[in-house]
Amino acid sequence: MDKATAVNTCLGVLKGRDCIYLDKVERDGLNNLTFTGDINGHLISQHRDEKDWFRYTLPFRQVLAYFACELDTYENLAETGHLNRSSFDLIEDSTWLKSLPVREDFNKDIYRHYRLFTYDDVYNIIAVSYEFAAEL
């Protein structure tokens, strides 16, 4: 069963609907998916209130699959309110990852399921790793 665990970033835990603002999502030819935008400096657990906004870059590496959904629709789909929880989670024991019919030459054990709540949308991403960087 899916278990969401908050990802601890260089800004600490990112929390709430107004925390992550997205300017751009880019996918390159190497299966990397990169998010860029701003983090609300009042909705983080470290460096809180030092700045109103922190620029961030969040590339996911070796992306196997991802999907996006409008936030309110996603919450209705999941039948759970999420607005005051973590905005960036690692989904442990992921049902979606377990059910993916990957190629035989792929090692499914190296992949992780991440969930990112932005102001407008929710992204579920299956990737090998990520790197979160913010301008402190």
How would you name each of these model-derived features?
Residues 1-136:
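Surface-exposed, interaction-prone regions used to assemble/regulate multi-protein complexes
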